[in-house]
Each structure stands twice: as structure tokens, then as C-alpha cells.
């Protein structure tokens, strides 16, 4: 007797967005849970998404002269304590190695939650002249932060990321680098992930522990909650002063270096899922999809059909990530399976279509089917993929714009917040920000570079100093 | 005043092999030390070597259907204890997370020294039928082992590696997979690293904790010491029984799966250095070299020379990893610098050569210089690189063969061992192996599939059961 497995259905996103999300993560086989809470297993299909992000960034880094390195997983507690804001921000969630199977360690070791202190210590050793600058290092690695509430990809005790750490002779150069990184992330969103972001500066309250300026890209999920998807920090000379990273400049003066750090993580995969997918499962934009095209013979035992399917597979496989499914399962099962997995294009090869010189192509992003001539469809594929990518980006962009409001009164702010999405308001500063967070649960996402909406802050009635985009967020 | 830095010289390998090795690691800027002993920083030039090994293996894995995944950094102590031999082998050197910045953990967590238990636990959850088999997973990651004596690349508390973990329905299939992996490593050595290995089974004493069979590739360093450079394990049903990984076979019987695991690490980079380099520094085989060709204009301010150098650079950069050095430093300094860094080919562009329509090409592996027509040299480069690679492999192979001896008496064994390198002897088993290790410091590297040299073991005088290749090793 055959064990027949049905393709598993996902929960409706309208009935339970959180369950819908974890259903997709698990049922599309992106991840599995391990036995330690907050640590997930990246399965082949999920890990391939991260590999494609890495490839995209590595390609860009090669053009800009950023070099990959690998710094240690651990550092001493002493090192951690050198920059005060930084340790205050990260210490509570840092994991410690205190012993081995055999004995206690003399000194506790911190597992990196981020690596500013390691890079700073190294830079202090090797930088002495303006000729040693800039240094443009990046590493892909795992980091550990002991988060309480965890959710696959979005927040884990361990996650995978890329962290850039650069050192410059001047403030201007470091500020340019900070902007370079956040613009690179915007480009990554636009070109690979089909994700539009709101990009801007973080408020004093929300900026990175140890930074002077933090820029962030923020994505808006389908449930109207925001997600911080990447950050870029101008560290000024904070770490340089704590670690004594000095250089002799061309004018013979000893000066502190200016530093930046910036990162995106596997969290981007969470955004990808939450922005694009539907109740049938995952919907992947074509350029990041591990399988871009799946070929399904409708009568797999029909020799003509099988031969044609193989021919098309061989034709396409040099250009695209393509999969030919010859499993002994029904076409219906296979359709559901690859819809669940969000494969952008499905080519159905059927005897009837072939008799008419045609194939059927299904597009996952709008669940549409069209017939194409089997002799000419190949030339259409680049256009199809491009259109799918563009439409997915535009749809997400439209959702973002439709859920971006502004408020002139605190009541209006609260009313807008009920509708989910972003609300802009001009505020007096951190006091207003804290009050808003306590009373509404919304946090400052980014500062907008736009004129004030109201001269006074609707929350404190003090003079407004900046317009800030608020939202509830993951 | 300019600060003039000399290219740093390395210690002679004949006077102090250990110092020569670490000099190259540090001065060729492959690594730097961190402040925690045993944890090293992989600098761009060193990390690029590992990236090229990863690319090679990923390309091969794609052909064979091995899929990349990422499993957690940690697991529970309970999980660790499930396979008895395994925990006995790895427990003493396992690092533990016991607390965070805020509080003690309820349960100690083990940082992976290797991930058999994590994969086994996952496989137990997802495998139920022969249709679920095989699973061919691989991960690139960091692992932690609390080694006492550490040496860059060769032995560290943290290292980077690739670990394959596969599951099969039959013993035969798993044994084939075990051999597939070790043969892949031999191919990697032959095609990318120009490293010949002795390949064979480990003795019972030396095999992996938890395995039935371990195959190993062993490289021979220039000082005559062996280095285990990669291993592949047939785990039998050991882990399957401990973790209850069972499947219903086509004959409806429930059976335990057969597993394999196999890995190579950044240790390969240590072998690369110790086998190929000389007293001028690193010598890199061309296909793994991060910079394959460096172009040095001898009169960088001469416009003709500069234009020609740039033209050649543009010509070559689409095909090779090529670097044009326009720094304001003397050609002599640059020559030493790239010799220290082991760049396989140096193209010198000089006014006098150009007047005769020529360029000079320096080959690092034999420190030879030849003139080539500047119009035709480009076509010679693939041949040059291939020849360099082949000659480097042959030289290492010759060294290996010249240092491989056999012994019919224990005294002969000891005499041969004085000359360094490998000594084969037919032994009675583990008792002889232990005696040899205690008395001579040599360990069993691999079992040879050759006829017995002597009917009795020269050490114990008992009946010999196998011929084993011994050596002192790293």
C-alpha cells in the first residue's frame, strides 16, 4: 500500500497572520525547529534564499572593493566593556561560554552578538598612517543574541548575517560609506527581493548602541506591521576613542579614524515571505527563487510528453534554475506542491497541448495560466520573469503607499494606527516617542526628511523638531 | 617624511619549520591572532583561499545533488549523550554556553564540535519511508573544539569547515557515499590545491568516535610530518539506533538507516602552505590563488608603460584574477611583496622590453623569468598556469614517494622514522599501535591495501593482521 501524502495547506493569512507565516516557513520546507528554542534549521530551500542574497552582495562587494574576512566567534568580556553604550545595548542578550567538557574557563567568553569590538581591536593594531586607510571589510557569519520571543527568520537566538566594518580618514568619507551601504540594501530589495523599503535615519532612542547615526530600511508586511530589514551605522570616532584607533594624517597630525558598520540578515527572508505570499503558500520573486521554473509532464508515461519535457528542461537549464519533476505523483499534487513553494513559473507539458504545438505556463504571482507556442515560448521567459518581478515590486509598493498616513493630532494618530501601517507625526523628541510607545505600542521607524506637519508636537504640545514615521513592528 | 616599510622576511624553513610556517601565515597576511588564544582572524587573502575551496565543492555538490543547509550552532547536553562513543570522543573538548548577560540557563548548551547528533535528530523526525531516502545534506559552518595546543589553520579552538551528513537505505549505498566523499577530496587536492594525498582506512584506534569505518586523506609536509587533511565516515546504524531513525522499506520491513558524515576544513590551507612554500614566502597553485597574475609597471610614471600595463590588465581581468599594482613603491619592493604572497605569475612591463615588443613573466613556483612577445603572451597563460599546477603537484608527489618507506623489523622502523616521512609496517593490531605511539611518537595514518610485509608483527611478535602506514603528524 502506498502512503499518500497530501500537500499540506496553510492557514489563511486573514484568520491568523502569525500562524499563516509559520505554516509557510515549515510547510514550504524553508526551516525546521531544533530542540533548542530560538535556534532554527535552515533547510535546503530556505538556505538557498540566503545563498542567493550572499551571491548578490558578494558581486556588488567585488565592484566596490569590499573584502570578505572571518573574525572569531568569541571575544573576552574585557573587550566587550570598552565602549560603554555598546555594552549597555548588547550585554543583556549576550551568550557566554564559561566552561568546556573538562573544566571552567579562567575568563568568560562572549559569543559575538555583533563584531564591532573585534574589528576595532584589530584596526587599532594595523592602522597607523593615512596610507592604511580606508579598510573595507565584510563578513558573512552567525551571531547569537538571547532574544526572548523568537520567530523563524525574524528574531532568533542565532541568525546568519553579513556585517560590514569600515574605517576611514574623514567624517565625510565615513558618512558616504554609511549611505552607500543603506543604498546597496535598497538596491538589493529592488533588484533581487522585489521589496520596497522606507529608508531613513533612526531617532536617538532607536539608533544602534554605540552609533552617532543609524540609517534603516523598513519593510511593511501584509498585516500592516513594519519590519526593520537592515541598518547602516555611522560610528563616528566612538570606537576609535575607546580602542585608540589613530593614524598620522597627511598633515602629520594624529587623528582618530571614523568608522561605519552595517548589516542585513536572514530576516530579509522573513520580509520576503510576509510581503509577497498568499493563502496557497509562498510566492517568490523570480531572481531569488531557488527554482525559477518547474516543468511538469501531465502524462509522464507518455513517451512523447516525456521526451518533450526533457528537451525543454535541457534547453532551459543552462540559463535558469529549472526543475523537471518526474516523480510518480499526480499533476494536481505537483501543482499544489510548487504553488506552496512559490516557484514563479510552471511549464505544463501535456499531450493535447503538444498536438497543437503548445505548452501551458502558469504564473504563481497572479495564479494565471496562458498557452504559448512550444517553438517560441523560450524567448518569452526573460520578459515573463521581468514582468513578474516588476509587478510584485509594484504591488508591494502600492500596499506601502496605501498604508502610509499622517496625523495632525494625537487622536488622529491613534485612529490611523488602528488601520495598521505607517503614521507620520511631527514630535518634540524622545519624551513624545516614549509616551507613544507606552500608550499605543507604535515605535519610531525612521525620521522623515519632510517639512513639519504641525509646529507643535500633538503629544507633548512642545515645539516639534522632526517628523517621524511610526508603526507597530516585528 | 615617508614611513618606508620593508617587505618582511620569513624565517628559513630549515632552521625553524614551525616559525617559518607562522611567519608565512602572518606576513603573507593570511591570518592575524585575536586576543583569545586559539581563535584566529581570517584576513581577506586567507579567507579568499577558503572561499575558492567552497566554490569548488559547491560546484561538485550541485552535480551530485548534495544540498546545502544550515543547522544550529548549539544543541542540548541531553542530545549529545545519545551516542556513547561519540560523546566520549568529543565531550572533553566541547565548549558550553551556561549563561547570558542576564541569567544562568536552565540547561547547559553544547557548541557544536561536529553536528552528527543534530542531523540525526532531524532525520529521525522526517524519515519514515524508503521514498524519503537518500538525504544528501552538507553545511559550511564554524565549529568549536577546545584544543590545548593550537596552530593557525592546523588546529584551532574554532575552525571553518564543510560537513556532509547523508542517510541511505542500504549499507552498500552508504559505503559508496563514504568513498564518494573521500574521492572528492582527493580530486580537490589534485585539481585545486596541487596536493597529493595518501588515502586509506583509519585503524580502529584512530577512527572517528561513533563510526564503523573512517577513510582519511593524509598529506606530507616538507618537514616530513603527516597531516590528516580530510575524513569520511561510514557510521553504519550506530546513530540510527541511538536516535531511532527508521524507515519502512519496499519489503514493508522497518529498518534502520545507514549514515555517513565527512568533512574538510580550513586545515587544508595549512597543508597548502606547508607543502608548497619556500623561504621567500608562500607559493600558491594557480587555480586557488586569490591573485593569479600581478602586473607591475617598472616605470609607473612613464605614460607608455602605464598605458600598456592598463591595457594588459583590462585584457586579462575578464578571464583571470589579476591585480595591477600602481602603488608609489619601488618595483623591487613590489616583487618581494608578491613573492611573499605567492602570486603564481608576475608580468613586468618595462620601457626597454616594450621597445622590443616584449614583456617579462616571472613564475613564482620556480622563481624563473622569461621574455614573451607582448602580442602573443596572452595565449600562453593558460598553458603556463596548467604547467605550474602540474609541476607543483608532481614535486609534492615526488616528495611524498621519496619519504615513504617500509620496515621488516622494529629497529628498521625506528631508523626510517628518523629520516621523517611515512613508514609502513605489518602489525598485529591496537596493542602494537599503542606501543609504537608511546615509544616513537608515530601514529597510524592509514591501513594499506597491500600484502603483508612480514607474517608476524615486529613489535609484538604476534601474527600480523594488516599493514599500516605510520608517521609523526600534526
From Swiss-Prot, chains A, B:
Consists of three domains: the N-terminal catalytic domain, the anticodon-binding domain and the C-terminal extension. It is an enzyme of class 6 (ligase). Gene3D superfamilies: Anticodon-binding domain (3.40.50.800), Bira Bifunctional Protein, Domain 2 (3.30.930.10), C-terminal domain of ProRS (3.30.110.30). Catalyzes the attachment of proline to tRNA(Pro) in a two-step reaction: proline is first activated by ATP to form Pro-AMP and then transferred to the acceptor end of tRNA(Pro). Homodimer. One of its GO terms (molecular function) is proline-tRNA ligase activity. CDD domains: ProRS_core_arch_euk. Its main location: cytoplasm. It comes from Phytoplasma australiense. Keywords: Aminoacyl-tRNA synthetase, ATP-binding, Cytoplasm, Ligase, Nucleotide-binding, Protein biosynthesis. It is found in: Cytoplasm. One of its GO terms (biological process) is prolyl-tRNA aminoacylation. Belongs to the class-II aminoacyl-tRNA synthetase family. ProS type 3 subfamily. It comes from the Bacteria. One of its GO terms (cellular component) is aminoacyl-tRNA synthetase multienzyme complex. This is Proline--tRNA ligase. It catalyses: tRNA(Pro) + L-proline + ATP = L-prolyl-tRNA(Pro) + AMP + diphosphate. It holds the Pfam family HGTP_anticodon. Its EC number is 6.1.1.15. HAMAP family: Pro_tRNA_synth_type3 (MF_01571). SUPFAM superfamilies: C-terminal domain of ProRS (SSF64586), Class II aaRS ABD-related (SSF52954), Class II aaRS and biotin synthetases (SSF55681).
Amino acid at each position: 500500500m502506498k502512503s499518500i501524502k497530501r500537500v499540506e495547506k496553510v492557514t489563511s493569512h486573514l484568520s491568523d497572520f502569525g500562524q499563516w507565516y509559520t505554516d509557510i516557513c515549515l510547510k514550504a520546507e524553508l526551516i525546521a525547529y531544533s530542540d533548542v528554542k530560538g535556534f532554527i534549521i535552515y533547510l535546503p530551500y530556505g538556505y538557498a534564499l540566503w545563498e542567493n542574497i550572499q551571491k548578490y552582495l558578494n558581486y556588488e562587494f567585488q565592484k566596490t572593493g569590499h573584502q570578505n574576512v572571518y573574525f572569531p566567534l568569541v571575544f573576552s568580556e574585557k573587550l566587550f566593556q570598552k565602549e560603554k553604550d555598546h555594552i549597555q545595548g548588547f550585554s543583556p542578550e549576550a551568550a557566554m561560554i564559561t566552561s568546556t567538557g573538562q573544566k571552567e574557563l579562567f575568563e568568560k567568553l562572549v559569543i559575538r552578538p555583533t563584531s564591532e569590538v573585534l574589528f576595532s581591536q584589530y584596526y587599532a593594531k594595523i592602522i597607523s598612517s593615512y596610507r592604511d586607510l580606508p579598510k573595507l571589510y565584510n563578513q558573512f557569519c552567525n551571531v547569537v543574541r538571547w532574544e526572548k520571543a523568537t520567530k523563524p527568520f525574524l528574531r532568533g537566538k542565532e541568525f546568519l548575517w553579513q556585517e560590514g566594518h569600515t574605517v576611514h580618514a574623514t567624517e565625510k568619507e565615513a558618512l558616504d560609506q554609511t549611505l552607500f551601504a543603506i543604498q546597496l540594501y535598497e538596491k538589493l530589495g529592488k533588484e533581487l527581493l522585489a521589496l520596497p523599503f522606507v529608508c531613513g535615519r533612526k531617532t536617538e532612542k532607536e539608533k544602534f548602541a554605540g552609533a552617532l547615526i543609524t540609517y534603516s530600511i523598513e519593510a511593511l508586511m501584509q498585516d500592516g506591521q513594519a519590519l526593520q530589514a537592515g541598518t547602516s551605522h555611522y560610528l563616528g570616532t566612538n570606537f576609535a576613542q575607546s580602542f585608540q584607533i589613530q593614524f598620522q594624517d597627511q598633515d602629520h597630525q594624529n587623528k582618530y579614524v571614523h568608522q561605519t558598520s552595517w548589516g542585513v540578515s536572514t530576516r530579509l527572508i522573513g520580509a520576503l515571505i510576509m510581503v509577497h505570499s498568499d493563502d496557497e503558500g509562498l510566492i517568490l520573486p523570480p531572481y531569488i527563487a531557488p527554482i525559477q521554473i518547474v516543468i511538469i509532464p501531465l502524462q509522464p508515461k507518455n513517451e512523447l510528453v516525456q521526451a518533450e519535457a526533457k528537451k525543454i528542461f535541457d534547453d532551459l537549464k543552462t540559463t535558469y534554475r529549472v526543475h523537471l519533476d518526474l516523480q510518480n505523483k499526480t499533476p494536481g499534487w505537483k501543482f499544489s506542491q510548487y504553488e506552496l513553494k512559490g516557484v514563479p513559473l510552471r511549464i505544463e507539458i501535456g499531450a493535447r497541448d503538444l498536438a497543437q504545438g503548445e505548452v501551458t505556463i502558469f504564473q504563481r504571482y497572479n495564479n494565471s495560466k496562458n498557452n504559448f507556442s512550444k517553438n517560441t515560448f523560450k524567448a518569452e521567459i526573460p520578459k515573463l520573469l521581468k514582468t513578474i518581478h516588476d509587478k510584485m515590486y509594484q504591488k508591494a509598493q502600492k500596499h506601502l503607499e496605501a498604508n502610509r498616513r499622517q496625523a495632525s493630532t494625537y487622536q488622529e494618530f491613534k485612529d490611523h494606527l488602528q488601520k495598521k501601517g505607517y503614521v507620520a507625526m511631527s514630535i518634540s523628541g524622545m519624551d513624545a516617542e516614549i509616551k507613544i510607545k507606552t500608550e499605543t505600542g507604535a515605535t519610531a521607524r525612521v525620521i522623515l526628511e519632510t517639512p513639519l506637519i504641525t509646529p507643535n508636537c500633538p503629544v507633548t504640545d512642545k515645539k516639534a523638531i522632526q517628523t517621524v514615521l511610526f508603526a507597530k513592528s516585528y
